[in-house]
Design a protein with these regions (language model features):
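Non-catalytic terminal/accessory segments
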Residues: 1-273
Length: 273
């Protein structure tokens, strides 16, 4: 937390991000940051005097007609939050051995909805059911005490944890500029919030994995589906007859592509992803 290079890296990472020229809760913008500002922040870190200002609240329209709360932090807080994110990423998402589950794709380096879809396509053959869920107001509902206790599983530096406490408890300004306490949640719009949410949601992944192991049985499906073989034989007969342009041939090919090679209703096999 005291190395100048880390703060310079944080500044370079966020200075050109969309929306970062929007004035923060202190009225300043990223182009007002200087080396003197960074030196002041580092000194305040050493003496534990750095304080996060309340975030400025704005409301962003959602596709369903509702509005999402977005907190705009002060310019100095943006840099410190990015430093926190960089450090947490090194702890929880190191290339040498990430803490998060391999199946977790949200708010992680080199991962996205596209990588999640590629994994489903490549590793989840013959899936019968998908369970869709949504964590309502995920960022807003995170319990501060529970989150910090989870962080303590990996982090022993109480100064760093105290800085995260300050971030969580910074409060917010409403549209009338009145200050309110932050009793729960991580500020949406904050650079550190996504990875803090991942630390919390990781416990859900752990529980899901526990359930998967408990209910899954049978390493591989043992019963092969006889229908694809019959259809393949029918296809070969049509090829030998030269009837590859017929409706019957197209139907057979389509059925071969759509029918799984193994028996999906095998009672001795339950596969869960």
């Amino acid at each position: 937390m005291y190395k100048e290079d880390v703060y310079m890296l944080a500044y370079e990472r966020i200075k050109s991000a969309p929306g970062n020229m929007t004035p923060g809760s202190d009225g300043t913008t990223m182009d007002g940051i200087s080396m003197s500002t960074i030196h002041t922040i580092i000194q305040e870190m050493r003496t534990e005097q750095f304080q996060f200002k309340p975030v400025r609240t704005v409301y962003i329209p959602k596709a369903n007609g509702k509005k999402r709360t977005l907190g705009i932090p002060s310019t100095r807080a943006k840099i410190v939050q990015e430093v926190i994110r960089l450090l947490l990423e090194g702890i929880y998402d190191s290339p040498n051995g990430p803490y998060f589950h391999e199946t977790s794709h949200g708010f992680r380096p080199d991962r996205s909805c596209h990588t999640a879809l590629r994994e489903i396509r490549g590793k989840w053959p013959a899936v019968n059911w998908f369970l869709e869920g949504d964590i309502q107001a995920c960022f807003d509902a995170i319990d501060h005490g529970v989150l910090v206790s989870l962080l303590r599983k990996k982090i022993r530096d109480e100064r760093f944890l105290n800085l995260i406490w300050k971030l969580l408890r910074a409060g917010y300004l409403d549209l009338q500029e009145a200050r309110h306490d932050s009793l729960a949640g991580t500020p949406q719009g904050g650079w550190a919030s996504p990875i803090l949410a991942n630390v919390s949601v990781h416990e859900l992944d752990e529980k899901a994995e526990e359930i998967r192991v408990r209910w899954e049985r049978g390493g591989k499906r043992k019963h092969r589906n006889p229908l694809p073989r019959k259809l393949s034989a029918q296809k070969e007969r049509l090829v030998k007859k030269g009837e590859t342009r017929t409706k019957e041939f197209r139907t057979v090919v389509q059925r071969i592509r759509s029918i799984p090679a193994v028996e999906v209703n095998d009672p001795n096999f339950i596969g869960i992803n």
